[in-house]
């Protein structure tokens, strides 16, 4: 029983790979995407079994982790979004306690980012989602630490987030939705 860190197929020669950050490889082919179906032998990100290229272990010996006995698959499956949220919010951002945070995307990565921002001392934590998130995901976001939820389907996201946070106290914007419009809005609200 193992789990991959989803380094996928990294080149090993670009600047990111040379620094050991294989997730940022310029030529990386990720696991479970339609455009690389054949690269991984038809394995997707949510299949029970996936073929991981052995070459990644020569580059990154810790690309595959053994799941300890007693840890269920369901528990192990959340390690990826938790680790990614932790790396983004706690290790790579310059968030200072007392600043505000905006998180785009109400999936596991976004929800874990909210939790970590709360632990790190963020004051206003704004979760941005869509109409379908109002009943299902927004209550969870509030439960794990979001102070405000903004419905991008009905509200001017940039205006509303800046009303809540103010441009000067907005310390971090995290984009977890994958939507182009969210990336554009993220950049608009930054100093």
Model segments located where?
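N-terminal Rossmann-like NAD(P) cofactor-binding module of classical short-chain dehydrogenase/reductase
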Residues: 3, 171-174
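Mid-domain Rossmann-like dinucleotide-binding core that forms the NAD(H)/NADP(H) cofactor-binding site
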Residues: 48, 69-155, 159, 172
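Beta-loop-alpha module in the N-terminal Rossmann-like domain of NAD(P)-dependent dehydrogenases
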Residues: 176-185
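NAD(P)H dinucleotide-binding glycine-rich loop of Rossmann-like/cofactor-binding domains
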Residues: 11-104
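Helix-to-beta-strand junctions that scaffold the AdoMet/dcAdoMet cofactor pocket
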Residues: 190-191
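Glycine-rich, N-terminal phosphate-binding loop of Rossmann-like dinucleotide-binding domains
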Residues: 6, 153, 177
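Hydrophobic beta-strand signal
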Residues: 2-4, 102
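Conserved amphipathic alpha-helix within the SDR
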Residues: 157-167
